[in-house]
Amino acid sequence: GPGPKLRLLPTKVTAEEIAQLPGALAPVQGRAPALILGVEESRLGAFRFDPNSEHHLYLFGDSKSGKTTFLRSLAREIVARNTPQEAQLIVVDRRRSSLGAIPKEYLAAYLTTNESVARDMAEFVAFLKERLPGDDVTPEQLANRSWWKGPEFWVLVDDYDLVVTSEGNPLAALQPLLAQAGDVGLHLVIARRMGGASQAVYERVLRSLIDLGSTGIMLSGNPDEGQVIGRVRPVRALPGRAIVVSREAGTFRAQLAWSDPV
């Protein structure tokens, strides 16, 4: 008889469609479901991100490879799974690509210039430092993070290559807090073009994300860029088709969730 049919990744799939897959909405360790990022190739199951156990993400890709779409899909997942009291977004968007994509009650700041990023980050870091646990915090409080109340903050950065310039990086003030993200309720998600990525991974903030074992995502790119994440080189691919490098799950291919522009 005919051989088994190869089940292939879709070329376009929405988070709503992925949510229908078995286990896509299963709670993680008794807590809320993880955020749906896409579909994994190996088992054609949901590729998920649990913000309780992982804090940050970074992604590289050529233009039109799906970076902005990924950030838009992620923002919509955050909004779908949280109240505005639970999650607030700070969006750094030099090209204004995501203007209007996030309901204003979830939007703490929408920053389009490096000057506004530098100014707001200084205030934001001062605010987050107030959340750092003091000497009087008990082990129980540490376990359930009950010594402060308020939303988790998601800093979503598009076109990171336009944000980091020869003058410096207006996000540098966040770097010392990245390792304590769980204590202060911080998530940093960076999207950058693939050109020059193999050098960009030595920039301080991005290097911190990598050193902390954050999940990295590579969309379409020129293989000549060389090894970008670990030993993995980019490949030319369809929009949204990704190579994911995860500390927990290893390296796998995925199709990232599509979401329509505003």
Language model: regions and residue ranges:
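P-loop NTPase catalytic phosphate-binding loop
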Residues: P27-E140, N144-S214, G221
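Phosphate-binding and hydrolysis-coupling loops of NTP-dependent motor/remodeling domains
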Residues: G1-E41, A46-R48, A191, S198-V262
